[in-house]
A protein has these predicted regions:
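Juxtamembrane intracellular "pre-TM" segments in multi-pass secondary transporters
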Residues: 2-4, 191-225, 249-250
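Extracytoplasmic
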Residues: 10-44, 239-244
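Residue-level signature of mid-helix packing/kink "hotspots" within the transmembrane helices
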Residues: 27, 57-65, 115, 149-150
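Extracytoplasmic gate region of multi-pass secondary transporters
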Residues: 29-30, 219-263
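Extracellular/periplasmic helix-loop-helix junction of adjacent transmembrane segments
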Residues: 32-62
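Conserved MFS/SLC helix-loop-helix module at the cytosolic interface between two early adjacent transmembrane helices
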Residues: 62-98
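Cytoplasmic helix-loop-helix junction between adjacent transmembrane helices
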Residues: 106-145
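Helix-loop-helix hairpin linking two adjacent transmembrane segments in secondary transporters
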Residues: 141, 145-190
Length: 263
């Protein structure tokens, strides 16, 4: 398990599934909207559904820098385990929600917990891999995000076969169980652990937060990368959140025109 040649790839494999769950759990709500709005009538309003999507994204975006700061100062293993456990518990709890407000606040909590994962996960992978394999390792990990989006798209199919409550419950249980698996198999890089201990014992090695932020904002490369990721995210998230609803409405419209929609 601790073999230096094998274990870095085990880390990628372990975190690949976490990345899958990270994006799958957030995507399920948009695909199951039509099933959920039967029981929670507020979801029939596009405005209310937009609020659910927005609260997650605003909190996720605002928390991401804080998540990076936290990941630099604590054990990333336990940060990953904790965030996975919390957002999986939130997913499980959504299956018991029967009001819009309950879904809204659970969605907000999901934004906080899911934001904690990506900085810690990528940092842990970067620590376990050298320059020759680091980009490949990160690239493989990123495929987990897209696999999660794709699988989350089948939430409506599962909800139709069982119920949206059951769908949330089972996907939540999977994440909770996997968090326990990570406790056993995921390891922190010892070199990083030594740096963290040194920071706690030698205060002079700590970089003041304000100074670090100033250096970051003064780096032109930071702004280029920020714009590079922000530009496709604007239409990307609109598509992810609203495409299932738009597709359903267009399909129903076409069926009605052709007289094929089962009334």
């Amino acid at each position: 398990m601790k073999n230096r040649k094998i274990y870095p790839w085990i880390v990628v494999g372990l975190l690949w599934f976490v990345a899958l769950l990270n994006y799958m759990d957030r995507q399920m709500l948009s695909t199951m909207k039509d099933a959920m709005q039967i029981d929670i009538i507020e979801l029939q309003s596009a405005t209310n559904f937009g609020r659910l999507m927005a609260v997650f994204l605003w909190i996720y975006g605002l928390m991401s820098p804080m998540a990076g700061i936290i990941a630099d100062r604590v054990s990333r293993k336990w940060l990953i385990v904790g965030s996975l456990f919390v957002w999986s518990a939130v997913t499980y709890g959504m299956g018991y929600a029967d009001t819009f407000n309950q879904i809204y606040w659970l969605r907000a909590l999901m934004g906080v917990s899911e934001a904690l994962y990506i900085p810690a996960g990528l940092s842990l992978i970067a620590d376990w891999h050298q320059e020759k394999s680091r980009s490949l390792a990160v690239g493989i990990h990123m495929t987990g995000l897209y696999a999660g989006q794709a699988i989350g798209g089948f939430g409506a199919t599962v909800a139709a076969a069982y119920s949206w409550h059951t769908t949330f419950h089972w996907f939540g249980i999977v994440g909770i169980v996997y968090a326990l698996v990570l406790i056993i198999f995921l390891r922190e890089n010892e070199e990083h652990a030594r740096v963290i201990r040194a920071m706690h014992t030698d205060k002079s090695k700590k970089i003041p937060l304000f100074k670090g932020v100033t250096l970051l904002f003064g780096n032109i490369a930071f702004w280029i990368i920020l714009f590079y990721f922000a530009a496709p995210s604007l239409p990307g998230w609109a598509t992810k959140n609203w495409l299932p609803t738009c597709t359903l409405r267009i399909s129903i419209s076409l069926w009605l025109r052709q007289g094929l929609y089962p009334l």
